[in-house]
Amino acid sequence: MKRSMYAGRVREEHIGQEITLKGWVGRRRDLGGLIFIDLRDREGIMQLVINPEKVSAEVMATAESLRSEFVIEVTGQVAAREQANDKLPTGAVELNVTALIVLNTAKTTPFEIKDGIEANDDTRLRYRYLDLRRPEMLENLKLRAKVTHSIRNYLDELEFIDVETPFLSKSTPEGARDYLVPSRVNKGHFYALPQSPQITKQLLMNAGFDRYYQIVKCFRDEDLRGDRQPEFTQVDLETSFLTEQEIQDITEGLIARVMKETKGIEVTLPFPRVKYDDAMALYGSDKPDTRFDMLLQDLTEVVKGVDFKVFSEAPAVKAIVVKGAADNYSRKDIDKMTEVAKQYGAKGLAWVKVVDGELNGPVAKFLTGIQEELTTALALEDKDLVLFVADTLEVANATLGALRGRIAKELGLIDNDKFNFLWVVDWPMFEWSEEEGRYMSAHHPFTLPQEETAHELEGDLAKVRAIAYDIVLNGYELGGGSLRINQKDLQERMFKALGFSAEEANDQFGFLLEAMDYGFPPHGGLAIGLDRFVMLLAGEENIREVIAFPKNNKATDPMTQAPSTVALKQLEELSLQVEEDETSKTN
């Protein structure tokens, strides 16, 4: 029979109606001769009642054979429950079954289909089709669909044009490692899966599209963590003839629309703007979480005269004050934080506690002469814990920024119901890579430098500033963008500053440079990480929870066993040969 409605949508208004439902058996209970079934579909759970006095012996026998995750079809009359279940939207009603058909049986599942399961991640991914049956996973993906629907409607209203760009593109040397695709037709040549549609969307501006968007898959072969996947989705925008402020206004409007339509939250516009240098100085991060205080304090000048060379001779001394937390952290706890500090390059972590108006701790004796000044500078009160890092400014900022976030989580200082958006602006154009031993693009090599610093492209690259902007939500980089270079000579200077010879630049980006000979308009844009955005809206801590079929932290899929080996014939067609490593040879 035709399904009447979703099980999770049956309400009191349907009492007395005969309906047909289809779904999965969530739970079966036998009570006083009656059989109760929780029927589950994507919209929720509906209680079924099978009464032996009102159904045939065949229906009763079928009901007795039901097990969890059997797929069934039932017909019956909606009735009011004697005792309502306030925890379910369908809790005021039940279905008195008159007909029952088993559409398919099921083996015992490797974990219960319910929220809050204890299965490990690889088991969940191995049986992802079962994991996705769980209500919280269904809700996460329904939320994702609502977000993308809201985004499309908003951008369509603003006359953005949805244009698909190629997945088989050219490998470029900047950024993360590419996923390469060998060409069978062009032996020895490779496509790259795009890390973003950056250049193609810029070329669409040159083509006169004016406003482009795409919700697009991107690929990066990089180390994984909770908010990264090898393939991910971004909301990609590009515009012509707009200022950075206008692009940011459009983006804020998009986010405000999504927040209202999916969470019922009105966000305050415009979002705060924080300069990059200020974000690093105050929060120790270029993606600051502003839901709590504990700002970094610069004490370099305050401690200059102390008889403690670690402080007095350090390039920078910075501190954070953990208010009222002196009793929360033992010496052993602080030793653990010291190990965290060392991971960020710090040589150690100094600390004092305020006890009965006095400073206590390993370095307290060196600070007695400046206790009053220190107390004023840090607004110290009894029971405060102060953590110091004496090192380069970069190390001090990064270390205390990491500790700030860790401590806030440990002490429950973060209001998880808050959504604090902000812009980080006035970025450096380049960042020094210890691994590469050179300056690299902080964003990408197509970012427009601020006019007043562009002359440093041939001088001190550390002084070049970009017209770039990142949007941050609760300590996560939600997205980033910039105005782009549209003048050929400036783009060539940028490539040269990054160490490209003219030949290398032409080999890698000649098509873009050539396009700049044909009236390339001023343009700029932005990309938002859709997976990360939905993760934060859903209150999850890993983007796997909002992606239907993600990879694990080894970039593999336990369900399909991808990546896998392929037949020798396939490799030969591609003129490829796999070399065994030494480990394989000895095993």
Swiss-Prot record:
The Gene Ontology CC terms held by the record are: cytoplasm
The signal peptide annotation in the UniProt record is none
Under InterPro entries, the record lists:
Aa-tRNA-synt_II, aa-tRNA-synth_II, aa-tRNA-synth_II/BPL/LPL, Asp-tRNA-ligase_1, Asp-tRNA-ligase_1_N, Asp/Asn-tRNA-synth_IIb, AspRS_core, GAD-like_sf
Please list where the region (Aspartate) is annotated.
Answer: 198-201
Reactions catalysed according to its record: tRNA(Asp) + L-aspartate + ATP = L-aspartyl-tRNA(Asp) + AMP + diphosphate
The EC number of this protein is 6.1.1.12
Chain positions recorded as ATP binding sites: R220, D221, E222, Q229, E477, G529, L530, D531, R532
Q: Which GO terms describe its biological process?
A: aspartyl-tRNA aminoacylation
Q: Where does L-aspartate bind?
A: E174, R220, H443, R484
Q: List the disulfide bonds.
A: none
An example molecular function term from Gene Ontology annotations: transferase activity
What this chain does, per the entry, is described as: Catalyzes the attachment of L-aspartate to tRNA(Asp) in a two-step reaction: L-aspartate is first activated by ATP to form Asp-AMP and then transferred to the acceptor end of tRNA(Asp).
Q: What does the annotation say about its assembly with partners?
A: Homodimer.
Q: What is this protein called?
A: Aspartate--tRNA ligase
